[in-house]
């Protein structure tokens, strides 16, 4: 398919700079696609450019689509293929989230606040607002339990032994909340910033609180928790949002 790049470029009235851009984009495209075009390979290419700037992505999509149409016109391709922005969405909906190795989350770090936030989500499946609402009085490290009081009700969650040292470190000098300044809880942005800084420091940039919570869900399911049990642990009104994780 690479052999058709130059004839394609020659068929268009392009400036020297545009020719270079087309050639560069199409060489990348052909390198990834190979000699046989199919939907799976096109989805792979689509995903490979997903994180580029909007202008760069549009340029590459346009160039690739023009080339695909040219290949169809000269009968190199029996079918007409076209890349669209929805292709990546279709693929991500089908992808099953995978469990990541979280050992690095427990290693020593200067970003101790962000670390504890991430561990509370990973270990207990808490939301950021639930983490922010943890009160010192409701943490019993001797019996390794957290009593979580929210608008949805009260949940008593077990604390793993590995989590205790991290909590002990942060409880020193706290008056009301686990995360506070002189008895006043930190803002939502504070939690976001500290979590973002920590996950970036360990090479997991882009790992959000939602994705960390998803890791808890996947591990609990793997451990044999039923959808109803997991729904209760998370304090959900209905297990409906968990159904996608339990589909065979």
From Swiss-Prot:
Native source species: Streptococcus pyogenes serotype M1
Keyword field contains DNA-binding: yes
Protein name listed in UniProt: Tyrosine recombinase XerD-like
Keyword DNA-binding (UniProt): yes
Taxonomic lineage from the root: Bacteria, Bacillati, Bacillota, Bacilli, Lactobacillales
Superkingdom per UniProt: Bacteria
Location of the protein in the cell: Cytoplasm
NCBIfam families: PRK02436.1
Domain Tyr recombinase: 85-248
Ranges of residues in domain Core-binding (CB): 1-72
Active site: 149, 213, 245 (o-(3'-phospho-dna)-tyrosine intermediate)
HAMAP family: Recomb_XerD_like
Chain's role: Putative tyrosine recombinase. Not involved in the cutting and rejoining of the recombining DNA molecules on dif(SL) site.
Family the entry assigns: Belongs to the 'phage' integrase family. XerD-like subfamily.
Keywords: Cytoplasm, DNA integration, DNA recombination, DNA-binding
Record-level GO BP terms: DNA transposition
InterPro entries given in the database record: CB, DNA_brk_join_enz, Integrase-like_cat_sf, Integrase_catalytic, Integrase_recombinase_N, Tyrosine_recombinase_XerD-like
Main location: cytoplasm
GO MF term set: DNA binding; tyrosine-based site-specific recombinase activity
A UniProt-annotated Pfam family: Phage_integrase
GO CC entries: cytoplasm
């Amino acid at each position: 398919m690479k052999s058709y790049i130059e004839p394609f470029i020659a068929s268009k009235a392009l400036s020297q700079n545009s020719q270079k851009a087309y050639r560069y984009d199409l060489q990348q495209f052909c390198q990834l696609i190979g000699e046989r075009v199919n939907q799976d390979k096109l989805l792979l290419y689509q995903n490979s450019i997903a994180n580029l700037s909007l202008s760069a992505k549009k340029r590459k999509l346009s160039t690739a689509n023009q080339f695909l149409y040219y290949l169809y016109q000269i009968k190199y391709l029996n079918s007409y293929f076209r890349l669209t922005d929805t292709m990546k969405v279709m693929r991500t909906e089908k992808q099953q989230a995978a469990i990541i190795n979280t050992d690095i989350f427990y290693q020593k770090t200067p970003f101790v606040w962000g670390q504890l936030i991430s561990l509370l989500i990973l270990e207990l499946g808490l939301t950021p607002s639930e983490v922010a609402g943890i009160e010192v009085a409701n943490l019993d490290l001797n019996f390794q339990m957290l009593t979580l009081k929210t608008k949805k009700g009260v949940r008593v969650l077990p604390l793993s032994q590995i989590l205790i040292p991290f909590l002990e470190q942060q409880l020193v000098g706290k008056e009301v909340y686990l995360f506070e300044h002189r008895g006043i809880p930190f803002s939502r942005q504070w939690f976001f910033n500290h979590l973002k800084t920590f996950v970036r420091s360990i090479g997991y940039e882009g790992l959000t609180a939602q994705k960390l919570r998803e890791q808890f869900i996947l591990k609990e399911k793997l451990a044999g928790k039923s959808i109803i049990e997991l729904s209760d642990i998370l304090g959900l009104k209905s297990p409906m949002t968990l159904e996608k994780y339990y589909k065979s």
